[in-house]
Amino acid sequence: MSPESKKITAHGSTSMPLSRTSKPQKFTIPLTVGAIFSVIGFLQRFFLASGKGDVQSLYTLSTMFILGAGPTYAGADYFICGRLFSFVPSAAPMSPIRVVRTFITFDVLAEVCVWTGAGLLAGAHTDTAARYKIGLNLIRAAMITQAFLFTSFVAILASFHVRVCALRAEWSVTSNGGTGRRFMMVVHSLYASSIFIIIRSAYHIAGHSFRTNEQPFLICEASLMLLNTAMFNVFHPGHILPIDSRVYVGIDGQERANETIEGAFTDSRPLLQKILDPLDVKGLFSRDKKRWHDPTAELEMDINSTLYAALT
C-alpha cells in the first residue's frame, strides 16, 4: 500500500469523530467536509496510479478535491475563531461576525479559483497552451490568496491572544484564569492549523510551477491535512467551548448567559465604511484601550480604576 493510500484510511477514521463527538456546530461541518474532500481526492489519485478508470476524469476530480480541501479546512478555522471571539468578547479585537463574514467570502473565492483552475489545468491538453496557463494562474492566485488570508488571520488571532493575557491578569486565579474552560487550547490549535495551511499553500504555489514528480507533494499534502484533522479530534473545540452561543466570559472571568449577546456583534457602521473597511481595521486603532466592555454593560469597568483600587 502506498503512503498516500495509507493516509486515506487515516483521514477517514479521524474525520468521523468530528461529527459525532459533540452537538454539531458551524465549524463541525467544514471540518468534516474537508476530510471527506481529502479522502475522495486521494482515492481518485489511487485509482489513477492503479490504472483504473479514465485517466483525464480521475486526474481532474482528484486535483479538484485535493486542492479544494484546504479552503474548506480554512473555513472551519474562521468559524472556530468567531466562536472564540464571541465567548471572550472583552478580548475580541473586532466583531466575530465581521471576521467570519470577511474571511469566508475570500475563502469561497479561493475555492472557486481552485476548482475552476483545476478543471482547466486537467483538460489543457485538449486545447491550447493558453488554457493551461489560465488554469495554472488561477490555482496560484487561490493559493496566494489563502496564504495571505491566513497571515492576516494569525495577526488577528495574536491580537486576541495579547488581549486575553492582559484580561486574565484581572481574573481570580484558577487553572485557566476565572473560567475553568481550557479555551486557550483552542487558540493554540488555531495557530497550529494556520501554520499547516500556510505551509500547504506555499508548497502548492511552488509545486505547480517547478515540480517534476508530484509524489512528494501529495505525501506532504496528506500528512499536513491528516495532522490538522487529528489535532481537532483530540482538542475538539466543541468539547471546550460552550454549545450555547449566548454563554460568554465577562470581564471578571466568570461565565454568564446573555439573551442578546448575538445582537452585541452586529455591524452598525455606515454601509460605505463596511464596504471600504470590512475587517474594521480602523476599529483596531480607534478602540478605547482604557475600558473593557461586558456585552450586558453590567460589568463595565475602568482598568485604571481597578488597578488603582488593587494597589490601595
Curated annotation (Swiss-Prot):
Bridged cysteine pairs (disulfide): none
GO cellular component, one term: membrane
Family per record: Belongs to the lipid-translocating exporter (LTE) (TC 9.A.26.1) family.
Alphabetical UniProt keywords: Glycoprotein, Membrane, Transmembrane, Transmembrane helix
Chief localization: membrane
Region Disordered: start-end pairs: 1-21
Topology of the protein relative to the lipid bilayer: Multi-pass membrane protein
Glycosylation sites: N258, N304
Composition skew (Polar residues), residue ranges: 11-21
Functional summary from the UniProt entry: Lipid-translocating exporter-like protein; part of the gene cluster that mediates the biosynthesis of hydroxamate-containing siderophores that play a critical role in virulence via intracellular iron acquisition during macrophage infection.
UniProt induction comment: Expression seems not to be induced during iron deprivation.
Intracellular or extracellular location(s): Membrane
Protein name: Lipid-translocating exporter-like protein RTA1
Keyword Ligase applies: no
